[in-house]
C-alpha cells in the first residue's frame, strides 16, 4: 500500500527556542498489506534511519485486525514498534472502536476511545490527533478539540509545533481529496496556535504545500502541510 516514507530532520527554524538537539523522524501512512511488498521495501530504508517513526494511520490493511497487524505490519514496519508514535486511520476502525489497533500499540497510542496525545521531541512539541471524526468527535466543544486547545495553550511558545493525523485537510489526489468538517476544525485550532507543520496520510501519494490557513489561503504564518 505504501508509496513512500518521508524522513525529516526537525530543526527549530524560525522558532524562538534556545539551541536544542535536533530530532529525526520518519513519517508514513497507509503502510502494510500482505498482498503487496511495498512495506517491506520502505522498511529496509527505515532500517538505516534513526529517530521516531510517525505512523500516519491505516497501518495494517485491510481491516486493522490483530491478524493484519501481526502477519502484515509486524514483519516489516513492526520492527520499529519500539520507536513508533501512531495515529489511527479509517481502516483501523473497520474493527469496532479500533480495538485491535489500541491493543497492538498499547499505551503509546493514547487512551482507547480517544487516540490523541502529545509529547516533546528535541525542541519540538508534537501533537498526534485522531481525524476519524465520525468515531471521535472533532468539532467545537468536543473532548478532542477541548484537549487540543488546552494542550497547545500549555505548550512553551519557544517550541515549534508539529501535528499529524490520518486525513489530510488539503490534497490534490483524486481518490479522497481534501477533508473538511471536523478536520478543518482541528486545523483552525492548530492555526490559531501557530502550528508549523502538519503531516497526514490517506491519499496514497506524496505532496507538500506552502504555508496556508485552514481555508487554503496562502499565509506565511500558516502551517506547512505534507501528505
Language-model region placement:
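N-terminal active-site segment of His-dependent metallophosphoesterases
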Residues: 15-72, 150, 171-172
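Intrinsic structural disorder/low-complexity segments
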Residues: 13, 169-170, 205
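Residue-level marker for buried hydrophobic side chains located in beta-strands
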Residues: 25-27, 53-55, 86-87, 163, ...
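Bacterial N-terminal signal peptides
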Residues: 2-12
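Extended active-site neighborhood of metal-dependent phosphoesterases/phosphodiesterases
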Residues: 47, 61-161, 174-197, 204-227
Amino acid at each position: 500500500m505504501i508509496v513512500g516514507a518521508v524522513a525529516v530532520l526537525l530543526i527549530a527554524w524560525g522558532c524562538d527556542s534556545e539551541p536544542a538537539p535536533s530530532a529525526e523522524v520518519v513519517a508514513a501512512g497507509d503502510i502494510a498489506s500482505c498482498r503487496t511488498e511495498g512495506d517491506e521495501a520502505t522498511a529496509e530504508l527505515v532500517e538505516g534511519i534513526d529517530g521516531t517513526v510517525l505512523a500516519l494511520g491505516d497501518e495494517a490493511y485491510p481491516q486493522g485486525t490483530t491478524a493484519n497487524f501481526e502477519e502484515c505490519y509486524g514483519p516489516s514496519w513492526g520492527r520499529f514498534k519500539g520507536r513508533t508514535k501512531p495515529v489511527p486511520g479509517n481502516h483501523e476502525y473497520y474493527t469496532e472502536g479500533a480495538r485491535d489497533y489500541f491493543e497492538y500499540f498499547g499505551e503509546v497510542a493514547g487512551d482507547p476511545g480517544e487516540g490523541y496525545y502529545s509529547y516533546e521531541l528535541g525542541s519540538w512539541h508534537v501533537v498526534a490527533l485522531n481525524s476519524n471524526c465520525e468515531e471521535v468527535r472533532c468539532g467545537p466543544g468536543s473532548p478532542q478539540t477541548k484537549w487540543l486547545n488546552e494542550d497547545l495553550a500549555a505548550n512553551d511558545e519557544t517550541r515549534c509545533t508539529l501535528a499529524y493525523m490520518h486525513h489530510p485537510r488539503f490534497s490534490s489526489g483524486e481518490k479522497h481529496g481534501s477533508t473538511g468538517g471536523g478536520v478543518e476544525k482541528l486545523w483552525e485550532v492548530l492555526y490559531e496556535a501557530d502550528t508549523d507543520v502538519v503531516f497526514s496520510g490517506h491519499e496514497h501519494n506524496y505532496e507538500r504545500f506552502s504555508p496556508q490557513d485552514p481555508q487554503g489561503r496562502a499565509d506565511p504564518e500558516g502551517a506547512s502541510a505534507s501528505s
